[in-house]
């Protein structure tokens, strides 16, 4: 990839633009019973969606960074049938050091999902807003292929810099088109995810299957630039733009499904039609 100031390591995620698009598109598609609250809270949920990359990483450092990825190939081999989905079982099998090094993304999603469900039960609307944003962030990370592999920045395949090029630069350049093309259709109806941990792992494994396509696109785009045929980002967009849109759209659908799941499991409480003003928060991890 073209190595720029934005090129980053595994601690990074989709860029702020992509995370905001996922959160905002999910809120805009909320179903009856949730729609008024989520539309009113859209801007604040969008702001919360980037807090894991800003506020939480600044506060929690390495502990937060490892919550944004899971290098499946550090723990097992495709198709990962022997990989425990239960965190305690994974730690018993591999040890804490190895699990922490590989990343804890799927279990972080489960933790925040539980926090959101509890916030709905307690009618803590401020926490519902914040955890909705956080959950959208981690869910989106699960759909970024380079968040699932130890070769997260192409450093093992001569694709250094591909991480930021794919998830941030390419999308920032085409942000308007990405926002429109990844919105959920009006016909979309959210569903309760009955086994969220199993579902989340399935999505992450599916994301891993796309890693080679992203790396190959970077290699081809660099070759095209060297031959002065095209701009690097134009080539990346042509080769993996559809893939990026597909993953962002899937992240949006899963985000809304998990919001709906948390609300449903909390007893479908009546949500206010307005959003409380931001509170001074002392959020726990």
Explain the meaning of each model-derived region.
Residues 128-136, 140-142:
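Short alpha-helix carrying the canonical HExxH Zn2+-binding catalytic motif
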Residues 7-130, 145-285:
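N-terminal, motif-rich segments that launch catalysis or mediate targeting to/interaction with membranes
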Residues 1-7:
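Bacterial N-terminal signal peptides
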